[in-house]
Amino acid sequence: MTGYKLSMTEARTAYNAGDYFAAYEDLMGMDLKESDEDLFKKSRLLGDLQKKNKEYQVFVKRKMYDLALDSLVSGVARYQDNLDEAKTLGIEEEYTKEGDALVQLLQDQYGVSVDDAVSMYRLNREQYSIKIDEIVETWRRNHINP
């Protein structure tokens, strides 16, 4: 089996198993045939959301709540930004499942709505950081030292 075929097989296997980020990593940097471009695009969109969820989990375990919140806010904003592309690629169901998981975490843990997350994501870096810090400080008061 050639390197290309092996990489494509590994990527398809990961994708079909629901490990979209691994599929994306398998395809990243490859000179893809046109017929394989859709798998790359699907893996990129779904993998991005999966990665944000994994980042969130890691940051929470490390008690890095500002970075955890940032992962959710950026993930939810990207979810909204790329929803039309996901529909075009025919992955709306999977994409919505991954995105809704981020939305639920953001709302349940930090009380931040989708609209607020998208608005925050559009702020300049300084304003964004200030907003993240404000939300985390409120969260800490309510969860760590109630």
What are these regions (language model features)?
Residues 21-39, 119:
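Repeat-mediated protein-protein interaction surfaces in helical alpha-solenoids
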Residues 1-2:
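Hydrophobic membrane-insertion alpha-helices, especially the h-region
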Residues 7-15, 24, 44-59:
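Conserved small-residue packing positions in alpha-helical repeats and bundles
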